[in-house]
Each structure stands twice: as C-alpha cells, then as structure tokens.
UniProtKB/Swiss-Prot annotation:
Methylates MRF1 on 'Gln-287' using S-adenosyl L-methionine as methyl donor. Present with 13200 molecules/cell in log phase SD medium. GO terms for cellular component: mitochondrion. This is Mitochondrial MRF1 N(5)-glutamine methyltransferase MTQ1. It comes from Saccharomyces cerevisiae (strain ATCC 204508 / S288c) (Baker's yeast).
Length: 314
C-alpha cells in the first residue's frame, strides 16, 4: 500500500481540522471528506469530532464510533466484539427480500421460518423478518455479546417474532432449541482463510473486529452439508471464495441421495466476486422457492429428481 504524501496531509489539514487524521484509513481525500461529513452528521452527542478523528487515526472502525450501520431499511446497532454488517451481505439479503415480495408467497402470505446461523448483530434475520410478510426466525450465535446485541437491535428496529439461541453451531451436540424444520437457512460464517487474514484484511478489521467471526476454512460448510441440509428446504450461505462453493457443490454432487434432491447455485456480488452458495431441496416448498429465485444467481447443479423440469442450469 503506497504511503500518504506529506502534501496530501497538509492539504487535508487546511480543509478541516482533523481531516488529515482520517487519511490512514480512508486513503483518499475524497473518501476522507465523505467520512468527515458522516461524522459531523451522525456522531453521538457525547463525542467530539476531534475525538472521532483520533479514533479513526487509531484504525477504530467507523461503525463502532457512530455505533450503527444502515442495513436495508434497518439501522443496525454496532458494538465492539461483534462483526460489523457488510454491504456484500446487505446486497444478497435485499435480493432475497425482493424475490420473495415479487412472488406468489407474498400474495398468499404463506408462512416462512428462517434460521440464521452465525447471526452476529442479527442484521440478516432482522432484515428478512422486517421485509417479508408472515415470517418468523431463529437466530443463532455462540457469542454472548452477539445475542445481547440482537436483542437490542430487535427493540430498536421494532422487529418481533424471533427466537434467539446461544450455542456453538460447530459443536458435536446440537441444541434442543434449534428449529425442527426450516424453510430458508441463512448464514454469514467465518470464511477468511488463515493464509489470507494477515495479508488481505484491513488493519481496522484485524485490530478491532472479532477474529472468531472472520477466520475459517471449510468447517462451517462441512457443518452446513452434514447437519443443516436435512433440516431445511433451502439455504443461502455467504462465501469468501469460489473454493468454498466448490466444496459444497462437490459434496452434494458426489452423494447419490443429496444429488437427487438438491439443486445448487452460485451468486456473484456486484464487484464480480463469488459471494453466495445457495440451494433448494426437491420438496413442495423447496420447488416453489427454486422457481422464485430463478434469477438470484446461476444454478450449477440441478437435482436429478427435477431433471425433467426446465431450469436455468449451466
């Protein structure tokens, strides 16, 4: 990463007091000015601009300073120790909401139960519950801080109809509080590989966000296939690279039973990066969801039980 020039620091100092302190994180004057604007408009009343700029100079994430992050129609409270919602996650969650609201399910108000694993702030579960009619949810996380923050976000955003479960999803023993059946399973698991964490991740993330919610290999996707697929009609799991999609696809295609009943797709984000592995089971509701999400991404494996049906499959 190139060093910030002395001339740029001087220029920023002349524009606004403390603006130059934002440059190490923002990198450009334009981004620093935008962030300074957000700070002046949204900073909690008990904090000063000078304090906020100094915090950013120390690489404290903006969302922890402002204490919130917009996510769809919601304003999600953010606190240290819990992963900050990302735009990449918001993008695919909003795509789910749009697809469901434009479908027959919205017209007939068919009930849906959503289970959100690795819930963090609860942004996925709460956004789906808020945006979809006749929807209930279960949100699961191992972190006490996360579960407390989900409760706070439910109150702030006036979202009800949810059950919170504190449990380690990767534990060999399942919780009795898990739902017995799920219509839509969602998750943003820790997926940054250890080899990539120090090299690719921003300083602010490495210093201040919980490593537990960031770093992972394939364990969460192994858990998805081994434990969750029998319980759900569909799933949407965020990924960090196409290798994680390939693992899930391979496990399903190489299993004669799973390959018969599961269709698997891949969604890229607006930056052209592999972002979501998703799938639909060949059950009555799973088939409906498959039709609803026909344009969500690209189906890469079609369930052999549906091989006689027309589908968008590469």
């Amino acid at each position: 990463m190139p060093r910030i020039s002395t001339s740029l620091i001087r220029k920023a100092s002349r524009i606004r007091p403390g603006l130059h302190l934002l440059l190490p994180e923002c990198r450009t004057l334009e981004q620093a000015k935008l962030e300074y604007k957000w700070l002046t408009e949204e900073l909690p009343p008990d904090k000063s601009i000078r304090w906020a700029c100094l915090q950013r100079y120390k690489h404290v994430p903006l969302q922890y300073i402002l204490r919130s992050q917009p996510f769809g129609a919601l304003d999600i409270v953010c606190k240290p120790g819990v992963l900050i919602p990302r735009w990449e996650t918001e993008e695919w969650v909003m795509a789910i909401i749009r697809a469901l609201n434009n479908s027959m399910l919205s017209r007939h108000t068919i009930p849906l139960h959503i289970c959100d694993t690795f819930t963090g702030t609860g942004c996925i579960a709460l956004a789906l519950s808020h945006g979809i009619a006749n929807c209930t949810f279960t949100a699961i996380d191992v972190s006490t801080r996360a579960i407390k923050l989900v409760k706070e976000n439910m109150l702030k955003n006036k979202v009800s109809g949810g059950k919170l479960v504190q449990h380690n999803i990767l534990s060999s023993k399942a919780s009795d509080e898990y739902p017995s059946h799920i219509d839509i399973l969602t998750g943003n698991p820790p997926y940054i590989r250890k080899r990539d964490f120090n090299r690719d991740v921003k300083t602010s993330v490495k210093l201040f966000e919980p490593r537990l919610a960031l770093v992972g290999e394939l364990e969460c996707y192994i858990n998805l296939v081994n434990y969750w697929l029998p319980k759900t009609d569909s799933f949407f799991y965020e990924i960090g690279d196409v290798e994680q999609f390939n693992y899930v696809e391979r496990r399903i295609k190489e299993d004669s039973y799973l390959s018969r009943i599961w269709s698997i797709g891949l969604k890229y984000d607006s930056n052209g990066k592999a972002r979501v592995v998703y799938g639909f089971k060949a059950t009555p509701k799973g088939r409906i969801l498959h039709q609803i999400f026909a344009s969500f991404g690209t189906i890469r494996h079609l369930a052999t039980a549906l091989s006689g049906h027309k589908a968008n499959c590469n």
